[in-house]
Amino acid sequence: MRQIEYGPDGGVDSMRIVEAEPPKPGPGEILIEVHYAGINGPDLAQRQGRYPPPPGASPVLGLEVAGRVAELGPSVSQWKVGDWVTALVPGGGYADYCVTSERHALPIPEGLTLAQAAALPEAWFTVWANLIDRAGLKAGERLLIHGGSSGIGLAAIGLARLVGAQPLVTVGNGQKAQFCQDFGAEVAIDYRQEDFVARVKQITHKEGVDVVLDMVGGAYLQKNVSILKRDGRLVLISFLQGSKVEFDFMPVMIKRLTITGSTMRPRTVDEKARIRDELLSQVWPALASGQVKTCLFGIYPLEKVGEAHRIMESSQHIGKLVLQLRE
Protein backbone atom coordinates (compact mmCIF):
# COMPACT_ATOMS: atom_id res chain seq x y z
CA MET A 1 0.00 0.00 0.00
CA ARG A 2 0.98 3.67 -0.28
CA GLN A 3 1.68 5.81 2.75
CA ILE A 4 3.22 9.20 3.41
CA GLU A 5 6.65 9.34 5.02
CA TYR A 6 8.49 12.50 6.09
CA GLY A 7 12.15 13.26 6.73
CA PRO A 8 13.94 14.15 9.97
CA ASP A 9 14.01 17.87 9.11
CA GLY A 10 10.20 17.94 9.18
CA GLY A 11 9.96 20.11 6.09
CA VAL A 12 6.98 20.07 3.75
CA ASP A 13 9.21 18.92 0.91
CA SER A 14 10.44 15.95 2.95
CA MET A 15 7.06 14.22 2.61
CA ARG A 16 6.93 11.47 0.01
CA ILE A 17 4.91 8.42 -0.95
CA VAL A 18 6.47 5.07 -0.03
CA GLU A 19 5.26 1.48 -0.27
CA ALA A 20 4.52 -0.47 2.91
CA GLU A 21 2.65 -3.53 4.11
CA PRO A 22 -0.94 -2.89 5.25
CA PRO A 23 -1.40 -3.06 9.03
CA LYS A 24 -3.31 -5.95 10.58
CA PRO A 25 -6.28 -5.29 12.86
CA GLY A 26 -5.96 -6.61 16.39
CA PRO A 27 -8.73 -7.59 18.80
CA GLY A 28 -11.59 -5.10 18.65
CA GLU A 29 -10.04 -3.29 15.68
CA ILE A 30 -11.07 -2.76 12.07
CA LEU A 31 -8.95 -2.27 8.96
CA ILE A 32 -10.26 0.62 6.87
CA GLU A 33 -9.68 0.98 3.14
CA VAL A 34 -9.05 4.73 3.17
CA HIS A 35 -10.78 6.84 0.54
CA TYR A 36 -10.26 10.24 2.20
CA ALA A 37 -8.07 11.40 5.08
CA GLY A 38 -8.56 14.66 6.96
CA ILE A 39 -5.68 17.08 7.46
CA ASN A 40 -5.32 18.67 10.90
CA GLY A 41 -3.02 20.94 12.86
CA PRO A 42 -1.55 18.03 14.86
CA ASP A 43 -0.37 16.49 11.55
CA LEU A 44 1.71 19.60 10.87
CA ALA A 45 2.98 19.67 14.44
CA GLN A 46 4.00 15.99 14.29
CA ARG A 47 5.85 16.50 11.01
CA GLN A 48 7.71 19.43 12.58
CA GLY A 49 8.68 17.39 15.64
CA ARG A 50 6.39 19.24 18.06
CA TYR A 51 3.73 16.54 18.62
CA PRO A 52 5.22 13.04 18.67
CA PRO A 53 2.84 10.08 18.42
CA PRO A 54 2.11 8.38 21.75
CA PRO A 55 3.70 4.97 22.45
CA GLY A 56 2.28 2.25 20.25
CA ALA A 57 0.65 4.60 17.74
CA SER A 58 1.50 4.60 14.04
CA PRO A 59 4.22 7.12 13.14
CA VAL A 60 2.38 7.81 9.87
CA LEU A 61 0.48 11.10 9.80
CA GLY A 62 -3.31 11.25 9.78
CA LEU A 63 -5.85 11.19 12.62
CA GLU A 64 -9.16 10.84 10.76
CA VAL A 65 -10.36 8.97 7.69
CA ALA A 66 -13.43 7.89 5.78
CA GLY A 67 -13.65 4.69 3.79
CA ARG A 68 -14.78 1.07 3.67
CA VAL A 69 -14.27 -1.58 6.33
CA ALA A 70 -11.89 -4.04 4.67
CA GLU A 71 -11.13 -6.52 7.46
CA LEU A 72 -12.26 -7.28 11.00
CA GLY A 73 -10.02 -8.12 13.91
CA PRO A 74 -11.02 -10.72 16.50
CA SER A 75 -14.11 -9.93 18.62
CA VAL A 76 -15.41 -7.10 16.40
CA SER A 77 -19.20 -6.88 16.69
CA GLN A 78 -20.26 -3.38 15.59
CA TRP A 79 -19.22 -3.51 11.93
CA LYS A 80 -19.03 -5.88 8.99
CA VAL A 81 -16.76 -5.93 5.94
CA GLY A 82 -18.07 -3.49 3.35
CA ASP A 83 -19.53 -0.96 5.80
CA TRP A 84 -18.77 2.69 5.05
CA VAL A 85 -17.42 4.58 8.04
CA THR A 86 -15.64 7.68 9.18
CA ALA A 87 -13.27 7.22 12.09
CA LEU A 88 -10.89 8.79 14.54
CA VAL A 89 -7.60 6.92 14.17
CA PRO A 90 -4.50 6.91 16.42
CA GLY A 91 -2.27 7.67 13.43
CA GLY A 92 -1.72 6.18 10.00
CA GLY A 93 -4.48 8.00 8.14
CA TYR A 94 -2.26 9.16 5.26
CA ALA A 95 -2.20 5.65 3.82
CA ASP A 96 -4.27 3.32 1.66
CA TYR A 97 -5.21 1.29 4.75
CA CYS A 98 -5.26 2.09 8.45
CA VAL A 99 -6.40 0.46 11.67
CA THR A 100 -8.53 1.82 14.48
CA SER A 101 -10.75 0.61 17.29
CA GLU A 102 -14.20 -0.41 16.09
CA ARG A 103 -15.52 1.85 18.89
CA HIS A 104 -13.97 4.95 17.30
CA ALA A 105 -15.76 4.56 13.95
CA LEU A 106 -19.08 6.15 13.05
CA PRO A 107 -21.48 5.75 10.12
CA ILE A 108 -21.41 8.33 7.34
CA PRO A 109 -24.09 10.91 8.22
CA GLU A 110 -26.98 10.81 5.76
CA GLY A 111 -26.58 13.42 3.03
CA LEU A 112 -22.83 13.89 3.49
CA THR A 113 -20.15 12.79 1.05
CA LEU A 114 -17.24 10.58 2.06
CA ALA A 115 -14.93 13.59 1.75
CA GLN A 116 -17.11 15.67 4.08
CA ALA A 117 -17.34 12.80 6.54
CA ALA A 118 -13.54 12.38 6.61
CA ALA A 119 -13.26 15.92 7.95
CA LEU A 120 -15.53 15.33 10.96
CA PRO A 121 -13.91 13.15 13.65
CA GLU A 122 -10.85 15.08 14.85
CA ALA A 123 -12.65 18.43 15.10
CA TRP A 124 -15.84 17.07 16.62
CA PHE A 125 -14.16 14.73 19.12
CA THR A 126 -12.01 17.71 20.17
CA VAL A 127 -14.76 20.29 20.59
CA TRP A 128 -17.06 17.88 22.41
CA ALA A 129 -14.30 16.81 24.82
CA ASN A 130 -13.32 20.39 25.57
CA LEU A 131 -16.52 22.42 25.38
CA ILE A 132 -18.94 19.87 26.84
CA ASP A 133 -16.79 17.62 29.01
CA ARG A 134 -14.23 20.16 30.24
CA ALA A 135 -16.06 23.50 30.08
CA GLY A 136 -19.65 22.32 30.61
CA LEU A 137 -20.96 24.75 27.98
CA LYS A 138 -24.72 25.11 28.26
CA ALA A 139 -27.69 26.97 26.83
CA GLY A 140 -27.69 30.73 27.24
CA GLU A 141 -23.94 31.04 27.76
CA ARG A 142 -21.57 33.07 25.61
CA LEU A 143 -18.55 31.33 24.06
CA LEU A 144 -15.56 33.09 22.45
CA ILE A 145 -13.79 30.93 19.87
CA HIS A 146 -10.33 31.93 18.64
CA GLY A 147 -9.55 30.72 15.12
CA GLY A 148 -13.23 30.72 14.26
CA SER A 149 -12.78 29.87 10.58
CA SER A 150 -10.64 26.77 11.22
CA GLY A 151 -12.08 23.28 11.22
CA ILE A 152 -12.11 23.30 15.02
CA GLY A 153 -13.61 26.79 15.08
CA LEU A 154 -16.46 25.97 12.73
CA ALA A 155 -17.25 22.77 14.64
CA ALA A 156 -17.30 24.82 17.85
CA ILE A 157 -19.76 27.27 16.27
CA GLY A 158 -21.98 24.34 15.32
CA LEU A 159 -21.78 22.75 18.76
CA ALA A 160 -22.51 26.05 20.52
CA ARG A 161 -25.63 26.55 18.42
CA LEU A 162 -26.67 22.96 19.00
CA VAL A 163 -26.65 23.37 22.80
CA GLY A 164 -28.19 26.85 22.71
CA ALA A 165 -25.08 28.91 23.48
CA GLN A 166 -24.05 32.12 21.68
CA PRO A 167 -20.76 31.79 19.75
CA LEU A 168 -18.47 34.77 19.18
CA VAL A 169 -15.31 34.28 17.12
CA THR A 170 -12.02 35.95 16.27
CA VAL A 171 -10.62 35.64 12.74
CA GLY A 172 -7.80 37.10 10.64
CA ASN A 173 -9.66 38.97 7.88
CA GLY A 174 -13.01 40.32 6.77
CA GLN A 175 -13.78 37.43 4.44
CA LYS A 176 -13.41 34.95 7.28
CA ALA A 177 -15.50 37.17 9.54
CA GLN A 178 -18.37 37.26 7.07
CA PHE A 179 -18.16 33.51 6.49
CA CYS A 180 -18.31 32.75 10.22
CA GLN A 181 -21.33 35.00 10.69
CA ASP A 182 -23.09 33.29 7.80
CA PHE A 183 -22.11 29.95 9.37
CA GLY A 184 -23.74 30.80 12.68
CA ALA A 185 -21.44 33.03 14.74
CA GLU A 186 -23.26 35.75 16.67
CA VAL A 187 -20.33 38.12 16.18
CA ALA A 188 -17.06 37.78 14.24
CA ILE A 189 -14.13 39.99 15.25
CA ASP A 190 -11.25 40.68 12.85
CA TYR A 191 -8.36 40.78 15.32
CA ARG A 192 -6.12 42.52 12.75
CA GLN A 193 -8.51 45.47 12.61
CA GLU A 194 -9.74 45.79 16.19
CA ASP A 195 -8.83 44.81 19.74
CA PHE A 196 -10.86 41.71 20.51
CA VAL A 197 -10.75 42.40 24.26
CA ALA A 198 -12.34 45.84 23.85
CA ARG A 199 -14.86 44.51 21.34
CA VAL A 200 -15.96 41.63 23.57
CA LYS A 201 -16.38 43.98 26.52
CA GLN A 202 -18.44 46.32 24.33
CA ILE A 203 -20.65 43.50 23.03
CA THR A 204 -21.25 42.06 26.50
CA HIS A 205 -21.61 45.46 28.23
CA LYS A 206 -18.39 44.73 30.17
CA GLU A 207 -19.84 41.51 31.57
CA GLY A 208 -17.58 39.17 29.57
CA VAL A 209 -18.09 35.67 28.22
CA ASP A 210 -18.65 32.39 30.03
CA VAL A 211 -16.18 30.26 28.06
CA VAL A 212 -13.15 30.90 25.85
CA LEU A 213 -11.84 28.20 23.49
CA ASP A 214 -8.22 29.10 22.73
CA MET A 215 -5.75 27.55 20.32
CA VAL A 216 -3.38 30.56 20.30
CA GLY A 217 -1.79 30.64 23.75
CA GLY A 218 1.09 33.03 24.42
CA ALA A 219 -0.01 36.61 25.12
CA TYR A 220 -3.64 35.61 24.57
CA LEU A 221 -3.70 33.92 27.98
CA GLN A 222 -3.92 37.16 29.99
CA LYS A 223 -6.32 38.69 27.47
CA ASN A 224 -8.61 35.68 27.66
CA VAL A 225 -8.73 35.88 31.45
CA SER A 226 -9.62 39.57 31.25
CA ILE A 227 -12.80 38.90 29.23
CA LEU A 228 -14.12 35.97 31.26
CA LYS A 229 -16.99 36.67 33.64
CA ARG A 230 -17.13 35.30 37.17
CA ASP A 231 -16.92 31.50 37.22
CA GLY A 232 -15.81 31.56 33.58
CA ARG A 233 -13.82 28.76 31.94
CA LEU A 234 -10.77 29.06 29.71
CA VAL A 235 -10.14 25.95 27.61
CA LEU A 236 -6.72 25.55 25.96
CA ILE A 237 -6.34 23.20 23.00
CA SER A 238 -3.17 24.46 21.28
CA PHE A 239 -0.39 27.05 21.59
CA LEU A 240 0.28 28.67 18.22
CA GLN A 241 2.02 31.58 19.99
CA GLY A 242 3.82 29.37 22.50
CA SER A 243 3.05 27.55 25.75
CA LYS A 244 5.20 29.67 28.08
CA VAL A 245 4.28 33.19 29.18
CA GLU A 246 4.48 35.48 32.22
CA PHE A 247 1.03 35.48 33.79
CA ASP A 248 -0.86 37.30 36.57
CA PHE A 249 -3.03 34.77 38.42
CA MET A 250 -4.84 37.33 40.59
CA PRO A 251 -7.85 37.69 38.20
CA VAL A 252 -8.23 33.90 38.23
CA MET A 253 -8.70 33.97 41.99
CA ILE A 254 -10.86 37.09 42.11
CA LYS A 255 -13.25 35.83 39.41
CA ARG A 256 -13.10 32.15 40.44
CA LEU A 257 -12.00 31.14 36.95
CA THR A 258 -11.22 27.65 35.72
CA ILE A 259 -8.31 27.13 33.32
CA THR A 260 -8.36 23.72 31.68
CA GLY A 261 -7.62 21.97 28.41
CA SER A 262 -6.85 18.63 26.87
CA THR A 263 -5.41 16.74 23.94
CA MET A 264 -7.19 13.93 22.13
CA ARG A 265 -4.55 11.53 20.84
CA PRO A 266 -3.17 10.23 24.18
CA ARG A 267 -6.66 9.42 25.56
CA THR A 268 -7.58 5.82 26.23
CA VAL A 269 -9.69 3.72 23.89
CA ASP A 270 -12.54 3.86 26.41
CA GLU A 271 -12.40 7.65 26.72
CA LYS A 272 -12.55 8.14 22.97
CA ALA A 273 -15.32 5.55 22.67
CA ARG A 274 -17.45 7.44 25.19
CA ILE A 275 -17.06 10.65 23.18
CA ARG A 276 -17.88 8.73 20.00
CA ASP A 277 -21.13 7.51 21.58
CA GLU A 278 -22.08 11.08 22.56
CA LEU A 279 -21.40 12.34 19.04
CA LEU A 280 -23.40 9.52 17.50
CA SER A 281 -26.46 10.31 19.60
CA GLN A 282 -26.22 14.10 19.89
CA VAL A 283 -24.40 15.43 16.80
CA TRP A 284 -24.77 12.90 13.97
CA PRO A 285 -28.58 13.39 13.70
CA ALA A 286 -28.04 17.16 13.51
CA LEU A 287 -25.48 16.70 10.73
CA ALA A 288 -27.90 14.47 8.81
CA SER A 289 -30.75 16.97 9.16
CA GLY A 290 -28.61 19.95 8.16
CA GLN A 291 -29.04 21.65 11.53
CA VAL A 292 -25.25 21.45 11.90
CA LYS A 293 -23.23 22.36 8.81
CA THR A 294 -19.84 21.31 7.48
CA CYS A 295 -17.26 23.24 5.45
CA LEU A 296 -14.76 21.56 3.14
CA PHE A 297 -12.13 23.94 1.76
CA GLY A 298 -10.43 21.57 -0.65
CA ILE A 299 -9.72 17.99 -1.71
CA TYR A 300 -6.15 17.07 -2.69
CA PRO A 301 -4.76 13.86 -4.19
CA LEU A 302 -2.22 12.06 -2.02
CA GLU A 303 0.55 13.27 -4.35
CA LYS A 304 -0.35 16.88 -3.42
CA VAL A 305 0.02 16.41 0.33
CA GLY A 306 2.78 19.04 0.43
CA GLU A 307 0.57 21.61 -1.26
CA ALA A 308 -2.22 20.91 1.21
CA HIS A 309 0.14 21.31 4.19
CA ARG A 310 1.42 24.61 2.79
CA ILE A 311 -2.13 25.92 2.58
CA MET A 312 -2.73 24.86 6.17
CA GLU A 313 0.45 26.60 7.30
CA SER A 314 -0.54 29.81 5.49
CA SER A 315 -3.87 29.97 7.37
CA GLN A 316 -5.58 31.21 4.21
CA HIS A 317 -8.14 28.40 4.24
CA ILE A 318 -11.61 28.31 5.73
CA GLY A 319 -12.75 24.96 7.12
CA LYS A 320 -11.12 21.60 6.46
CA LEU A 321 -8.77 20.10 3.87
CA VAL A 322 -8.75 16.40 3.00
CA LEU A 323 -6.55 14.03 1.01
CA GLN A 324 -8.13 11.76 -1.59
CA LEU A 325 -6.65 8.27 -1.89
CA ARG A 326 -9.34 6.59 -4.01
CA GLU A 327 -12.14 7.61 -6.36
Model segments located where?
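Mid-domain Rossmann-like dinucleotide-binding core that forms the NAD(H)/NADP(H) cofactor-binding site
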Residues: 118-193
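Short amphipathic alpha-helix with an adjacent loop that forms part of the alpha/beta core around
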Residues: 196-206
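NAD(P)H dinucleotide-binding glycine-rich loop of Rossmann-like/cofactor-binding domains
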Residues: 78, 84-147
